[in-house]
């Protein structure tokens, strides 16, 4: 580890690992020491830093061996120790400091440990939060946010609370935290805090700047920019192709060096290059090419090492950390002053710089051939050398620094490697009570408490593979339980107590504090916001490449296993818990899976072992728990040292009250897994962060992730994401790329998350979205830019908190997602909210692009969307909103000049629609407008071209000419850097002749200059037609949220993105990349939560209110959008009005609607809910918009997914002509060329109209994304089991199409379509409702349903005893006598578990989990798409919840009859997925149904697998021969095993069956073609169990009850021997003896189950017995006490009726025993139990 020294593990057989980064004995370590020249600021332009800080001061500061304790402010104390401190004196100092703090502050302080974890720190202080990260490094953005939130929450909880920052090593860590908190607290900007902020600034400049690292300053710059909105979020993944070193460092005696790169994403290695041998005089630079491009998203660390020639050590040449959210150029340059280590190293040339060349796709960049190295540079690809493979960070914090097993030698030297983690804890030595074996339970259990303090997320070696698999843990992972927090509904903000400043005062304060930190520093990446100066061939200046060419979502990024030509570093601990492992480290068990961790490395709030009082596995957390500070939620992954998780973010309160935690991190939002466990009352801030593993994680490419939130939030999450896997070298680059993308998709399938999940994050964060082209923070704002006034109003603390939340969400979005459990938050964990799981921040990219989730309207048709009523709906836009000029009835199909493609769903706005003026483009804001009842036409406005920045905000002036609008919206597209010519070329490629005149700037290989010709605005590119294949793909996969991993090749995607013409470039502003919206959080009008709420409100307090209070203002932008998008509140509109979603073009045609940045192909058909193609969007010239029949809009509003458009020019599939379908042609088949049978068409489905559920069309385009629509199938199909355990509420009406949106759907019925979506649904779900259901029994533990013990929830498998009087004999006909009748408290149908997650893969499986893709027509395609042939070796496709892209193979036009008649209207999984039924029950359900009927259940024989039972027309011949006689109806139900693996789910034993990302995908594919099944599956449109119940006659109801049985908890009182007595006398006698007995018997709670087999008693606590069974034939009588005596309960809850049954004494044929019980649950009265027993006895022929 670049962090500590080697530990001698005396207690274990392990030998110390070699530390390859130690300098050779005689070598001086110039690079490791902060030398005097440190005074040179990383950015020469930071004039405010005084040059007076001399070298001697710097050296003295760093070399000082004294403890340094400074009161930065009265309530923030910094305690710093030099890294060279001797252990003995260090321990002594620790004790002294602890004594001083206790004497002065008592227990009112929290110690934030920013260094390695230590046992003594945990023991000496009452409250410790571990946020450590490696010395001299910078923490993940999300960790910075977590720390700030934790500090703010604690400081605001009470006036006497104090924060202590503990650091051992370089002061840079303190500086990052202090500077970040200064910016964070500046948001609230109260006058009484000005002095504190000034003090923080002073501390930072005096103590930290001289010794800090450039990357640390860069991250502070990111954080402040994201908070203020000055940095626009780029939430797209980037593919790194080249790393060019200009200038050769002299690390060899004769000059030159032997460099090799290691790239880390979220502190996990994702790439290791070969070793380049460069002679000092050979040339002036080296180009390290990564082929195919390496997908990067989130927090990136690139470390360049020099491999010594004859010594087995390596030197660090330079190190640089950056976050992709702030990279707005495809070519960025870091000068020497920006490179960690190198900036003070004389061996690195002064003029040296490092250039990174990115693109939006993995394919080779055309025109970069000149970057090849000369013949004198040789490359050694032998990366098996441990020196090269060694990961310096894998063991960070695995063990405590002061662990008794060994001592730390030279703790200060980075590069020391900790001993590999032992397989067990050390018992008493390490503070544990007992030594515990750490099981590598990659399949199912979690590691238990041991894990809590150990596998740091970052250490999880297999992250790469892990990420890939969306493995479906069939329920073992409990991670989401604790880790996820759902959105906070928003607690009332506590008064802040600070005077709010007026804008003038605020400006004054700003002037006072100006110059702090990096505000004045130039942006750390060299992309200047303004026109970029031409690049100089050499020199320290950076190349400014402002052109922001990325269109969100353009390249189908799937974070999948990526392959580099050189294998990735080996991932050592292949343990199921590693971050990568998507399995969830179950938090209950103490481990979290990365997924639930939300992909954030959790800051380990108390890493369960850091708090002193308690077993080592608990942090002070226990104490805090005891003190009520926070819930005992084991820190999952608590040991992740470099955890990106916010503490706050990471903790998801388990409590249902989301709103209690004002500072809940974005994770809550994102990851919002609604899983909160009710009982805790602890404040969120103290909860151990749950690493949401990549929940929200990284939606990588997830469609929903693209949100424009402030990078901060998103970035954080991403940081934790697992990186794409490096595939084996054997596969081709294209395949690797494809795999990588798929993996992305899988991961992305969340948040959100995030982040992510979310995970991804859905585009919630308002903060980033301000659209105004804002100059980069460091540059003055161009006068013309319409940026929001700096402080339009003083935001309240709640708003600030909220904005932070939004940021968090954003971070999540960016974080690389791990899909596994991450995307699967367990079923709704909150009782009051159906939890939609993040699909992975998470969210999975629905379409494989980063599409922006469009908010979904989840409204039963009787309600209108509640947009208008949402307080947030009022546009808080920085600039004046454009009047809603045509918001009423006239359809507006104006073609906007710059045509950023927006999803054209516009419904007509109703008068006064309120839109978010500044809605982040990232969220496809649906316009909240409603159409008047009379004009229910679907307006489709032609989407503006993708080039327009995705700004949702219109310029200040009212409706200006389109020209002006586009001008203001578009910033000049100045491309500089290696990529410039490429972009320009691409643009010209698809432009009309006029457009092609835009000259491209090219850089000549020789001089690194760009030849730049002035760009001319081009005319809008003609609309790209959506290819029918895409449509068919969507149609075919309604439930699986099919992602089209490759709708078009990356090249096409890239070209498409860039083809957007730079229309109207203004010379003044910088072109903001689409999707990068810049809205200061404060402008959103969000109501932040007050941190005090966390501490003050008991957790259960507001539980029921979340869904109920429709008046409460949305807590967060996300929430407001969700509310707006869903019709959760009835009454906002006249009941029958259709909901109108208007997606106005940005130019203001619909001024008041939300602008939806997502591009929608102008001609691509939108399919109406009823399945008919409404008609394609009008082509550019089409004068009329398509009109949807009113009923389609009103009743079914958009359920069908939008089709993702494919670039026409290069796509290999045929595109349909732009002509629009007229409304009258709704029924006409829309045949897809891919399906000869026309399967792609949608047949109108008459039933569809009756579906009240409405989901917005699932096409989400990321704002700015090139015209490709990112489509999410908006069917209400729950995410596949692999993804979220979906809350299955039968009533759920719609699934939010993308996680970002529905995350907070308020509608009580909306089942999250994809886990990440409804992640935070607010509807309250009663514990008995199906929302609690889990996919498999194992999953029931921690989350809501897992909380069965706490909530009293009974597993759905055994109904409670019916209490309806009509049910019992002697009363009227038992209507509801069937076991699942409504009389049962559990409710029917059985709660639908969220589909199960895939199990975590075992270590062995993980390493083989790289799917390969074959290519068709030069495009990568999955085996499915290439003709369904069996996957080539090892090429199983890992679809994340989506089906293969059928658009790959082009077929002649097809006849309509084969068109897939798949219904998009409703989620059908609740009908066919019955996890808890037995094989026999499945046969009974199916044997009388038509062939093709099927049920999928959890396999009882194979853990983690599923059983598919399907009815066939005739049994196999072998069965016919064997059973020539008798009834063969049971044989007509055939059974297949669906196995889960890292690649997904597939039918076992069928070689030509592909792997599917989820059960939904498997089901929908087999409903289209049988593949290996006997016939096609017929997707049911109603619940077979309901049908069976309807058909059953009342006469056999007793039989049905017998089969299923009933159960409940009762009090067992006593057993009295009766000899041969039975009947009422026996009961009476037993009661009499019991009541007079002395002492009175103690009542014990037992589970009382009655079935056809008899009565079974289970003592849950095993006090008296474990289980007793009384066969039915031994039970002779059962009744209430004839004398109606009562039992007095000890809990004082009142008397309870007594009842009993008489059974034969075991081993006797004559003697009886009377067993007495008292009723326990008022809902299960004794009379109901007795009646049921009697009924069962009657059914078996016995008498009472």
From Swiss-Prot:
GO MF term list: actin binding; phosphoprotein phosphatase activity
Organism placement in taxonomy: Eukaryota, Metazoa, Chordata, Craniata, Vertebrata
Compartments, as annotated in UniProt: Cell surface; Cell junction, Focal adhesion; Cytoplasm, Cytoskeleton
Bias-annotated ranges (Low complexity): 580-589, 763-773, 1156-1169, 1208-1220, 1421-1435
Any one annotated GO CC term: cytoskeleton
Biased composition (Basic and acidic residues): 1004-1014, 1041-1054
Region described as Disordered: spans on this chain: 15-55, 467-505, 569-589, 666-686, 724-797, 934-956, 982-1077, 1156-1437
Name the record gives this protein: Tensin-1
Record GO biological process: fibroblast migration
Family note: Belongs to the PTEN phosphatase protein family.
Domain C2 tensin-type positions: 235-361
Native source species: Gallus gallus
């Amino acid at each position: 580890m670049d962090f500590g020294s080697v530990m001698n593990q005396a207690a274990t057989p392990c030998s110390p690992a070699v530390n390859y980064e130690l300098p050779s004995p005689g070598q001086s370590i110039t690079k490791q020491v902060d030398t005097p020249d440190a005074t040179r600021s990383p950015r020469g332009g930071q004039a405010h830093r005084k040059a007076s800080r001399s070298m001697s001061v710097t050296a003295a500061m760093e070399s000082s061996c004294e403890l340094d304790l400074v009161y930065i402010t009265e309530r923030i104390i910094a305690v710093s120790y030099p890294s060279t401190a001797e252990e003995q004196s260090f321990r002594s100092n620790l004790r002294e400091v602890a004594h001083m703090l206790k004497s002065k502050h008592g227990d009112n302080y929290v110690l934030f440990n920013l260094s390695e974890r230590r046992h003594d720190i945990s023991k000496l202080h009452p409250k410790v939060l571990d946020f450590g990260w490696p010395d001299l490094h910078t923490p993940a953005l999300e960790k910075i946010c977590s720390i700030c939130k934790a500090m703010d929450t604690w400081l605001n909880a009470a006036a006497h609370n104090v924060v202590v920052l503990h650091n051992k090593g370089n002061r840079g860590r303190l500086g990052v935290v202090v500077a970040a908190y200064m910016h964070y607290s500046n948001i609230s900007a109260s006058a009484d805090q000005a002095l504190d902020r000034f003090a923080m600034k002073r501390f930072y400049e005096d103590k930290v700047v001289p010794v800090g690292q450039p990357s640390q300053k860069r991250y502070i710059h990111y954080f402040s920019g994201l908070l203020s909105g000055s940095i626009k979020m780029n939430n797209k993944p980037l593919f790194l192709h080249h790393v060019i070193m200009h200038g050769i460092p002299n690390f060899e005696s004769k000059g030159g060096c032997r460099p090799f790169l290691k790239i880390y994403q979220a502190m996990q290695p994702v790439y290791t290059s070969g070793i380049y041998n460069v002679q000092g005089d050979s040339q002036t630079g080296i180009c390290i090419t990564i082929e195919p491009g390496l997908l990067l998203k989130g927090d990136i660390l690139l470390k360049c090492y020099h491999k010594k020639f004859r010594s087995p050590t390596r030197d660090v040449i330079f190190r640089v950390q950056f976050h992709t959210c702030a990279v707005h150029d495809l070519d960025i340059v870091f000068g020497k002053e920006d490179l960690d280590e190198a900036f003070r190293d004389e061996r690195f040339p002064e003029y040296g710089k490092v250039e990174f060349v990115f693109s939006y796709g993995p394919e080779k960049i055309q025109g970069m051939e000149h970057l090849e190295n000369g013949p004198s540079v040789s490359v050694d690809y032998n990366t098996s050398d441990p020196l090269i493979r060694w990961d310096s960070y894998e063991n960070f914090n695995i063990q405590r620094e002061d662990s008794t097993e060994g001592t730390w030698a030279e703790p200060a030297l980075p590069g020391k490697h900790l001993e590999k983690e032992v397989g067990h804890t050390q018992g008493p030595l390490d503070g544990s009570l007992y030594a515990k074996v750490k099981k590598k339970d990659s399949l199912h259990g979690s590691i238990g408490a041991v894990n809590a303090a150990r596998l740091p997320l970052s250490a999880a070696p297999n992250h790469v593979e892990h990420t890939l698999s969306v493995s479906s843990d069939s329920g073992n992972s409990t991670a989401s339980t604790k880790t996820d927090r759902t959105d906070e509904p928003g607690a009332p903000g506590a008064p802040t107590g600070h005077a709010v400043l007026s804008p003038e005062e605020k400006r004054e304060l700003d002037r006072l504090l100006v110059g702090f930190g990096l505000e004045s520093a130039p942006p750390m990446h060299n992309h200047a916001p303004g026109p970029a100066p031409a690049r100089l061939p050499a020199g320290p200046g950076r190349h400014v490449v402002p052109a922001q060419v990325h269109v969100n979502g353009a390249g189908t990024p799937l974070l999948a296993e990526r392959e580099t030509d050189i294998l990735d570093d080996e991932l050592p601990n292949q343990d199921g818990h590693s971050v990568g492992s998507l399995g969830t480290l179950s938090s209950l068990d103490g481990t979290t899976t990365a997924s639930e961790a939300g992909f954030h490395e959790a800051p380990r709030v108390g890493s369960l072992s850091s708090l002193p009082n308690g077993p080592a596995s608990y942090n002070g957390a226990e104490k805090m728990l005891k003190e009520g500070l926070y819930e005992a939620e084991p820190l999952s992954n608590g040991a992740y040292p470099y955890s990106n998780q916010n503490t706050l973010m990471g903790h998801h309160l388990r409590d249902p009250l989301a709103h209690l935690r004002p500072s809940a991190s974005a994770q809550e939002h994102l990851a919002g897994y609604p899983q909160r466990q009710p009982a805790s009352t602890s404040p969120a801030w103290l909860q151990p962060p749950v690493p949401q593993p990549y929940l929200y994680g990284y939606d990588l490419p997830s469609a929903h992730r693209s949100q424009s939130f402030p990078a901060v939030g998103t970035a954080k999450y991403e940081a934790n994401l697992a990186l794409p896997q490096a595939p084996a070298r054997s596969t081709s680059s294209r395949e690797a790329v494809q795999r990588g993308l798929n993996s992305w998709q899988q991961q992305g399938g969340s948040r959100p998350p995030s982040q992510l999940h979310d995970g991804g994050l859905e585009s919630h964060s308002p903060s980033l979205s301000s659209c105004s082209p804002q100059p980069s923070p460091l540059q003055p704002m161009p006068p013309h830019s319409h940026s929001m006034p700096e402080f339009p109003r003083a935001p309240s603390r709640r708003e600030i908190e909220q904005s932070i939340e939004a940021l968090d969400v954003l971070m999540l979005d960016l974080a690389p997602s791990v899909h596994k459990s991450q995307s699967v938050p367990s079923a709704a964990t909150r009782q009051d909210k159906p939890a939609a799981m993040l699909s992975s921040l998470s969210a999975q990219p629905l379409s494989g692009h980063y599409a922006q989730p469009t908010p979904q309207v989840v409204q039963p048709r009787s309600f209108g969307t509640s947009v208008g009523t949402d307080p947030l709906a009022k546009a808080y836009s920085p600039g004046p909103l454009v009047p809603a000029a045509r918001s009423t009835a006239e359809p507006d199909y104006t073609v906007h000049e710059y045509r950023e493609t927006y999803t054209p769903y516009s419904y007509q706005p109703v008068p006064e629609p309120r839109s978010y003026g500044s809605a982040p483009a990232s969220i496809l804001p649906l316009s909240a407008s409603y159409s008047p009842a009379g004009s229910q036409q679907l307006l489709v406005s032609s989407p503006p071209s993708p080039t327009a920045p995705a700004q949702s905000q219109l310029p200040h002036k009212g409706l200006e000419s389109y020209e002006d609008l586009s001008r203001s919206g578009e910033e000049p597209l100045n491309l500089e850097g290696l990529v410039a010519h490429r972009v320009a070329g691409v643009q010209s490629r698809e432009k009309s002749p006029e457009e092609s005149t835009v000259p491209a700037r090219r850089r000549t290989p020789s001089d690194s200059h760009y030849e730049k010709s002035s760009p001319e605005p081009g005319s809008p590119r003609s609309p790209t037609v959506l290819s029918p294949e895409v449509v068919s793909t969507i149609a075919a996969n309604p439930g699986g949220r099919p992602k089209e991993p490759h709708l078009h090749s990356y090249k096409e995607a890239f070209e498409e993105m860039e083809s957007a013409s730079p229309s109207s470039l203004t010379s003044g502003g910088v072109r903001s990349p689409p999707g990068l919206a810049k809205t200061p959080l404060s402008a959103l009008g969000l109501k932040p939560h007050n941190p005090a709420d966390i501490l003050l409100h008991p957790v259960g307090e507001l539980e029921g209110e979340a869904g109920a209070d429709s008046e409460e203002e949305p807590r967060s932008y996300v929430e407001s959008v969700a509310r707006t998008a869903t019709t959760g509140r009835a009454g906002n509109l006249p009941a029958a009005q259709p909901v109108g979603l208007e997606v106005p073009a940005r130019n203001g045609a619909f001024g008041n609607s939300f602008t939806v940045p997502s591009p929608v192909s102008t001609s691509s058909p939108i399919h109406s809910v009823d399945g008919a193609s409404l008609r394609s969007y009008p082509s550019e010239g089409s004068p009329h918009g398509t009109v949807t029949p009113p009923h389609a809009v009103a009743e079914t509003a958009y359920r069908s997914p939008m089709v993702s458009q494919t670039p026409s020019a290069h796509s290999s599939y045929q595109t349909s002509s732009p002509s629009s379908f007229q409304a009258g042609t709704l029924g006409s088949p829309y045949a897809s060329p891919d399906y000869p049978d026309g399967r792609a068409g949608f047949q109108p489905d008459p039933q569809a109209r009756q579906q009240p559920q409405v989901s917005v069309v699932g096409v989400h385009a990321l704002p700015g994304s090139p015209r490709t629509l990112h489509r999410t199938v908006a069917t209400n199909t729950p995410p596949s089991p692999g993804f979220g355990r979906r809350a299955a509420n039968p009533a759920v009406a719609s699934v939010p199409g993308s996680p970002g949106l529905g995350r907070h759907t308020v509608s009580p019925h909306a089942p999250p379509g994809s886990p990440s979506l409804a992640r935070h649904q607010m509807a309250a779900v009663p514990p008995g409702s199906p929302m609690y259901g889990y996919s498999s029994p194992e999953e029931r533990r921690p989350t809501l349903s897992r909380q069965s013990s706490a909530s009293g929830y009974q597993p759905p498998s055994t109904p409670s005893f019916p209490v309806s009087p009509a049910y019992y004999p002697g009363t009227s006909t038992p209507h509801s006598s069937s076991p699942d009748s409504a009389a049962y408290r559990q409710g029917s149908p059985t709660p639908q578990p969220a589909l199960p997650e895939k199990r975590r893969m075992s270590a062995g499986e993980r390493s083989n989990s790289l799917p390969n893709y074959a290519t068709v027509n030069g495009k990568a395609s999955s085996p499915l798409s290439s003709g369904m042939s069996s996957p080539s070796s090892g090429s199983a496709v890992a679809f994340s919840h989506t089906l293969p892209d059928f658009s790959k193979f082009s077929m002649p036009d097809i006849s309509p009859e084969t068109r897939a008649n798949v219904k998009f209207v409703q989620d059908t999984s609740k009908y066919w997925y019955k996890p808890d039924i037995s094989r026999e029950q499945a046969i009974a359900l199916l044997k009388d149904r038509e062939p093709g009927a099927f049920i999928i259940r959890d396999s009882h024989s194979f853990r983690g697998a599923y059983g598919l039972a399907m009815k066939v027309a005739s049994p196999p011949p072998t069965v016919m021969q064997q059973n020539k006689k008798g009834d063969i109806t049971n044989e007509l139900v055939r059974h297949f095993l669906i196995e889960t693996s890292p690649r997904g789910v597939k039918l076992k034993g069928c070689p030509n069956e592909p792997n599917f990302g989820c059960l939904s995908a498997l089901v929908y594919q087999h409903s289209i073609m049988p593949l290996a099944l006997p016939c096609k599956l017929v997707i049911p449109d109603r619940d077979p169990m309901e049908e069976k119940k309807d058909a059953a006659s009342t006469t056999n109801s007793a039989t049905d009850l017998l089969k299923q049985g009933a159960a409940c908890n009762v009090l067992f009182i006593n057993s009295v021997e009766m000899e041969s007595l039975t009947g009422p006398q026996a009961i009476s006698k037993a009661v009499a003896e019991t009541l007079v007995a002395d002492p009175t018997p103690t009542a014990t709670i037992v589970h009382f189950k009655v079935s056809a087999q008899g009565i079974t008693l289970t003592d849950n606590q095993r006090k008296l017995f474990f289980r007793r069974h009384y066969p039915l034939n031994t039970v002779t009588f059962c009744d209430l006490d004839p004398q109606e005596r009562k039992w007095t309960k000890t809990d004082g809850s009142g008397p309870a009726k007594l009842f009993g049954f008489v059974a034969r004494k075991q081993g006797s044929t004559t003697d009886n025993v009377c067993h007495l019980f008292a009723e326990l649950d008022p809902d299960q009265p004794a009379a109901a139990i007795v009646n049921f027993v009697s009924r069962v006895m009657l059914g078996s022929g016995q008498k009472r």
